[in-house]
Amino acid sequence: MNNKNIDIIQLLYERDLIAQITNQEALIKILKSKSITLYCGFDPTSDSLHIGHLVPLLCLRQFQIFGHRPIILLGGGTGLIGDPSFKDSERKLNLIETVQKWIEKIKYQVSLFVDFSHSQYSQACIVNNYDWLSSISLLTFLRDIGKFFSVNKMINKDAIKKRLQKNNYGISYTEFSYNLLQSYDFTYLHKNYNAILQIGGSDQWGNIISGIDLIHRIYKRTTYGLTMPLLTKSDNTKFGKTEKHTIWLDAKKTSPYTFYQYWINTSDEEVYRFLKFFTNIDVDAINTLKKEDKMKNTKPQAQIILAEEITRLVHGKSGLKTAQKITRNLFTGQIHKLTLDDFEQLFQDGIPTVPLKAGITLQQALVESKLVVSRAQARELISSNSITVNSKKQLKTEYIFCATDRLYNRFTLLRRGKKHHCLITWE
């Protein structure tokens, strides 16, 4: 892409990545005239980021490609408080030691998306707001920062108003103070790093505006804010979650196979929008792909492209290759081609599992695994050639598992029909 022929704001609009923006014309003018420093904050609520964090991370990446310097703020301080924005209830307060451990793990994850290696101006950096929030005294904070905030305005912000209307408990002073802390973060980064733009999800609009106002009150300078749409699925369920799991970026929490499958199962209504959000594929190429998929009677290619692009980005070429291999062999029945590590991924979170003891019959295993509801149904499906043990159809209704059924002396894969699987782990 030729950066001289398009500005970063235009690019983000083309990819539907802007929800709100302040002082747009002035910001575009500055972005075209010089390199700026911008930041986005991530509060650690676990030891891993999840796929909901991908949009702001990739947005930071786009700004860096255009020659701007991204700062990733990890909320070691604000993460101890909890952001009440559009949350129904008070967050659990975590120990300082726990939050700091989470931050160390998250540092590696964010390094996958922005470049820390360049010595030029656009080199990214990571900061931890615990470093400055923990060193300012309460009296100093209230006198120097608190005096600029009107409680009347704060309780009328949508994020707080909805919380106050939701339940009888309302909001604690701890979480109510979060808005001041995030505003102070912007002020600190403006003073010490010359940050003039904060980006975040659309739920952060109120916090970002407060930071802009605080900087103007203290320094009489103009800064900017930009938010991206919060992703929801077409059925209004929360993006980034399945019925059982949050889709994490850490392979130990969400295996590359499950990560890949999540994107493969993206609906036709969502997939082209997600290609704009999560890949660098040109928008014209995405629109062409959409037309081609609609003209074909076969399965759309968009989901495969999306899954490949994002899995490669997060888990590398080897992670993608493994996810594709497991997918291919699992659904073609070539179980003998799966390695022990492949089975470990399936056991981690890939398919349902059931622990069983030696001597159990196939009928019992099918019931225990919930692949069938009764032994009668089990006998019927076995007789009709619908049950596979590892790679082989099993027609014996009274079949008892033997040692050769145990792959790597631990696993046996049951399949009902073509799509329903369960992994036996032998005790």
From Swiss-Prot:
Binding site for ATP: K241
Keyword set includes Thylakoid: no
Summary of the function given for this chain in its UniProt record: Catalyzes the attachment of tyrosine to tRNA(Tyr) in a two-step reaction: tyrosine is first activated by ATP to form Tyr-AMP and then transferred to the acceptor end of tRNA(Tyr).
GO terms for cellular component: cytosol
Main subcellular location: cytoplasm
Name assigned to this protein: Tyrosine--tRNA ligase
EC code: 6.1.1.1
InterPro entries referenced in this protein's UniProt entry, alphabetically: aa-tRNA-synth_I_CS, aa-tRNA-synth_Ic, Rossmann-like_a/b/a_fold, S4_RNA-bd, S4_RNA-bd_sf, SYY-like_C, Tyr-tRNA-ligase, Tyr-tRNA-ligase_bac-type
Motif 'KMSKS' region: where in chain: 238-242
Assembly mode: Homodimer.
